[in-house]
A protein has these predicted regions:
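Conserved catalytic network of the ASCE P-loop NTPase/AAA+ motor domain
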Residues: 43-45, 74-79, 147-150, 166-170, ...
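Conserved inter-motif catalytic segment of the P-loop NTP-binding fold
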Residues: 83-200
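The Walker A/P-loop phosphate-binding site
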Residues: 1-118
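Intrinsically disordered, low-complexity domain-flanking/linker segments in eukaryotic proteins
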Residues: 26-42, 148-166, 250-259
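Terminal-proximal interaction/regulatory segments of ATP-powered molecular machines
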Residues: 360-489
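Active-site/pore-lining binding-face segments in mid-to-C-terminal subdomains
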Residues: 312-357, 361-377, 381-386
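Phosphate-binding/switch region of NTP-binding enzymes
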Residues: 206-344
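Helical mechanochemical/support elements of P-loop NTPase systems and associated helical scaffolds
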Residues: 61-64, 93, 132, 136, ...
Length: 489
């Protein structure tokens, strides 16, 4: 009898599971660059199938999660798919979500109110008054199991490669914004709490059962979401744990949790260990300078002393399966407008990287970007420019992603540590038009058959470096040098 040289049961997991790009720096922290079949580099980072966001009150965790999911919907559910916000705290205002999208570019936004008003729309808001958390999950659990049986013909092509050198296909995206898991009510818990007396021993047992039900639910999520082609993020509250024994030492499951902070209303082990990433807000404050003026005013004329519209929140990644654990991220928010993605990129360049990719005039009185040197700006004009000048915002975005790879991706080839000023010079020397690049490209990947509705080419900073070095010819760009003499189309 011949010796068996290989096991009889070998089933390969996908070569990669595409993530949803939702924010330049968040995506870089949670991903890696992958070379596509078309010779372009694509960033596989961002929202994974299961994600967690935690923090105390007023740390913008709900806004962060909602912004990411609205971005995901606009980018990946343009022609298919479904998104839902499960509001367990009865605090969601659809008009606020519309306001959060005012800083999105045209190709990544969508008619949220129109989708909500349409009973067959691609976006929905539900809450605990309409259905309990266990009923909501049980229905989704069943749907995901059915979706897992889909054939390749039902899926959409991505730019990512599979084992055989073909394209990875995905089901139309379903995504869910659960805010919050802490307050998500389970049917059995509701019935039992109605009968009991507040604070009784019986009530304490009920809440232990509630935690057990949520632990089972999150465990199922980690299995069902990848199989069913869905993405889910959930928020949880952090608070100080109460010690019954004041002399007992602190026991922390993860090193990033300071003091005796503890997740409330969720099973800590499942919430922190099963998601691909778990971000926790550790600090929050106003963005005011030493003179109590806004660090970044809306305009030179409108800057007002003591204006606290701008907030900065520092997040720490407690769990990072797609990136380093313990890394911190500073996100910037306007209390009126929501997350300011590109202002956060500039803050990263200016304050964290010490002015990487820019020329600083005087004592930080003004700046020019190496990738867009034509525009001079100050701290009080940058917010307006980021809203009105797409080329400026794109230059900030590219520079921030270059800076992140330069200083954080230590194991990558030295070629991709190129300085922005060198990139600008070499790409221009190759005959490309930087105005075309900044105006008509995006960093995020999209489904291959969505190009006509997006009408922007995916060109990451890595692809730009390959263009600069003559390793990639961007024949798809209007400014491709060969098009002027008819050699390429």
């Amino acid at each position: 009898m011949a010796i068996i040289t290989r096991p009889s049961n070998i089933k390969r997991a996908p070569l990669t599971r595409p993530k949803l790009n939702v924010n330049p720096l968040y995506d870089m922290q949670n991903g890696r660059m992958l070379l596509g079949m078309d010779g372009r580099w694509y960033l596989n980072g961002g929202l994974a199938q299961l994600n967690g966001f935690g923090g105390r009150g007023n740390t913008w965790k709900s806004t962060t999660q909602r912004t990411f999911h609205l971005k995901a919907h606009g980018r990946y559910c343009r022609n298919r798919g479904f998104g839902e916000n499960m509001d367990s705290e009865f605090s969601v205002d659809p008009y606020r979500s519309v306001q959060l999208m005012q800083n999105f570019w045209e190709e990544e936004t969508f008619d949220l109110m129109g989708e909500l008003e349409n009973t067959e729309g691609s976006y929905n808001v539900t809450d605990n008054s309409e259905q309990t958390g266990d009923h909501w999950w049980d229905c989704l659990h069943g749907d995901l199991n059915k979706r897992a049986e889909a054939k390749k013909a039902d899926k959409c092509a991505t730019p990512f490669r599979d084992y055989e050198g073909g394209l990875i296909h995905m089901l139309p995206i379903w995504h869910y914004d659960l805010d919050s898991a802490s307050q998500l009510s389970m049917a059995s818990t509701i019935k039992q709490t109605e009968k009991g007396t507040a604070g009784s021993a019986e009530q304490q047992t009920i809440w232990m059962r509630d935690a057990g039900a949520k632990a089972q639910m999150i465990t199922q999520m980690a299995y069902d979401l990848p199989r069913g082609g869905a993405f889910l993020s959930m928020t949880a509250h952090l608070d100080d744990s109460i010690k019954l024994d004041t002399y007992a030492p602190s026991t922390k499951k993860l090193a990033g949790l300071k003091g005796d902070l503890k997740f409330k209303g969720v099973p800590g082990r499942q919430f922190t260990f099963l998601p691909s990433s778990c971000y926790v807000a550790t600090a929050e404050g106003n963005m005011l300078d030493s003179a109590k003026m806004p660090e970044y005013g809306i305009s030179e004329r409108d800057a007002m002393k003591g204006d606290t519209d701008l907030k900065i929140v520092r997040y720490e990644q407690l769990r990072g399966k797609g990136g380093p654990t313990g890394i911190v991220s500073d996100f910037i928010y306007s209390q009126q407008e929501g997350m300011l993605e590109h202002l956060g990129c500039f803050y990263y360049l200016h304050k964290i990287l010490g002015g990487y990719g820019m020329t600083i005039k005087g004592n930080s009185l003004g700046f020019t970007l190496d990738l867009y040197p034509e525009v001079y700006f100050t701290r009080n004009t940058i917010r307006g420019l980021l809203k009105t000048d797409r080329k400026f915002a794109r230059a900030v975005e590219i520079t921030a992603m270059m800076g992140y790879e330069r200083f954080m991706w230590h194991a990558e080839p030295e070629l991709y540590k190129m300085e922005p000023a060198v990139l600008h010079k070499l790409v221009k020397e190759k005959g490309y038009d930087w105005n075309d690049i900044l105006e008509n490209t995006i960093y995020w990947w999209h489904f291959n058959d969505d190009f006509n509705s997006i009408n922007k080419h995916t060109v990451t900073h890595r692809t730009l470096i390959d263009m600069a070095m003559g390793l990639h010819e961007a024949v798809y760009l209007a400014s491709y040098p060969g098009k002027s003499n008819g050699t390429s189309s």
